[in-house]
Regions:
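Acidic, glycine-rich loop-and-strand cores that form catalytic or ligand-binding grooves
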Residues: 133-169
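Serine-hydrolase catalytic machinery in alpha/beta-hydrolase-like enzymes
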Residues: 1-63, 67, 72-76, 80, ...
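Acidic catalytic loop of the alpha/beta-hydrolase fold
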Residues: 118-121, 194-196
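Short, proline-enriched alpha-helix->beta-strand connector loops that line the catalytic pocket
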Residues: 105-110, 179-184
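A conserved short beta-strand
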Residues: 83-93, 108-109
Length: 197
């Protein structure tokens, strides 16, 4: 129920005509890395197959997003499965062992969002508790862009403030030279914490 309330996706799905699902990992977490249990990649693939059998879902238009561990899981699912058309992780960079083990065989478009003041999954990387070290947020996006076949150049754009009183600003970084099916955007939320934008 938390992500349903936080994202407001139900209303957007009704308005735009798409189906949204809110899977929940065991103990509010996900196995977003090599080995271990449960096999959350298999779980999410099975969930997608069940939804496709029940509803008219275009198999080429399945997307994943998530906050924190959910954002990490969206990336790991794209690393391990051909299921997704694109991802949009929020405040969730892959732990270094997962990033090193990512074996994507095709470009997967991505839109990353991360706050510079995130104290749970630090923007600058490193550790924030018992988890393995996280890659810095901008490096995580850059490495994804490189794996997609994008060039090293990027465009930086300061965005208009949607909520001038919230103490944050947003900057969009768009990687250049990406293949048509491999665009990568990174939204840096200056002053933003570990939260949904």
């Amino acid at each position: 129920q938390g992500m349903r309330r936080l994202t407001g996706f139900d209303a957007i799905a009704d308005e735009e005509g798409f189906i949204v699902a809110y899977p929940q990992g065991i103990r509010r977490g996900w196995n977003s890395g090599p080995g271990g249990t449960p096999d959350d990649v298999a779980f999410l693939e099975a969930l997608a197959a069940q939804l496709q059998a029940r509803y008219a879902i275009d198999p080429d238009r399945i997307y994943a997003t998530g906050l924190s561990a959910g954002g990490m899981m969206s990336q790991w699912l794209a690393c391990e499965s051909e299921l997704l058309a694109a991802i949009a992780p929020v405040a969730g960079t892959l732990p270094t062992p997962s990033a090193d083990a990512c074996a994507r065989t095709r470009p997967v478009p991505a839109l990353f969002i991360h706050g510079t003041e995130d104290s749970i999954v630090p923007f600058g990387g490193g550790n924030a508790g018992p988890a393995d070290g996280f890659r810095p947020a901008e490096e995580n996006a850059r490495l994804w862009a490189a794996a997609n076949g994008c060039g090293t150049a990027f465009e930086v754009e300061q965005l208009e403030e949607a909520a001038p009183d919230d103490g944050t600003t947003a900057t969009r970084i768009t990687y250049a030279g990406c293949p048509d099916a491999g665009a990568v955007h990174f939204y840096r939320i200056d002053g933003g914490g570990h939260t949904w934008p």
